[in-house]
């Protein structure tokens, strides 16, 4: 067999994704019980770390560490996103710069502006995609990045994807107060494959 093939399945109730290249296993990804990168939490500020400008926070999945956490006071609720898997015995690595990623679009609430992947070089294609971005985002204060796979995607699918992510971002941003809670689960192997 020549070419690339993505194989999706389940093993012991967990998602599994495999990449086959020219008939050989190239990559394999098993889902775990650990929180997935991209998970968005409403966390509660716990205690600052002097000298580092960071803060420990409480999440439903355990303690997290937030870098550059200036202006936060203990007990304050904040929205954070998991950036990567935590090392054993360490706090979850978190950021306040939340991104809402999907197949075609990335919505950036804290970074306004409409952008298209640099890998799309065809000017006509870029203009078409920019038109879709303008029509779907309107006067929104949120930013948008259209990913490289938009080059071959259907316009309606791109528009639907942008709307879904913008709606999710708007909904999540209104849920800033309250107890620690998982608001959005990160993508698993099937979605990322």
Predicted regions and their residues:
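Short aromatic-glycine-enriched beta-strand elements
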Residues: 15, 51-57
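Structural detector for short beta-strands of small beta-barrel domains
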Residues: 3, 7, 37-49
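Beta-strand/loop nucleic-acid-binding surfaces
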Residues: 27-33, 56, 61-72, 116
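Short, conserved beta-turn/loop elements at beta-strand boundaries and strand-helix junctions
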Residues: 48-53, 85-88
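Residues located in well-ordered beta-strands
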Residues: 42-44, 65, 81
């Amino acid at each position: 067999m020549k070419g690339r093939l993505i194989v999706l399945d389940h093993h012991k109730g967990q998602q599994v994704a495999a990449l086959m290249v020219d008939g050989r296993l190239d990559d394999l990804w098993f889902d775990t019980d650990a929180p997935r990168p991209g998970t968005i939490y409403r966390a509660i500020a716990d205690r600052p770390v002097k000298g580092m400008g960071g803060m420990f926070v409480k999440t439903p999945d355990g303690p997290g560490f937030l870098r550059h956490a200036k202006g936060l006071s203990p007990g304050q609720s904040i929205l954070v996103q998991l950036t990567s898997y935590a090392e054993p015995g360490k706090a979850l690595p978190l950021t306040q710069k939340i991104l809402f990623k999907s197949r075609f679009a990335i919505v950036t609430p804290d970074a306004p502006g409409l952008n298209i992947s640099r890998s799309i070089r065809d000017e006509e294609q870029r203009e078409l995609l920019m038109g879709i971005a303008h029509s779907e985002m309107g006067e929104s204060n949120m930013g948008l990045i259209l990913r490289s796979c938009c080059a071959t995607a259907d316009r309606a699918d791109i528009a639907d994807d942008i709307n879904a992510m913008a709606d999710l971002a708007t909904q999540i941003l209104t849920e800033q107060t309250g107890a620690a809670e998982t608001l959005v689960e990160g993508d698993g192997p099937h979605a990322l494959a």
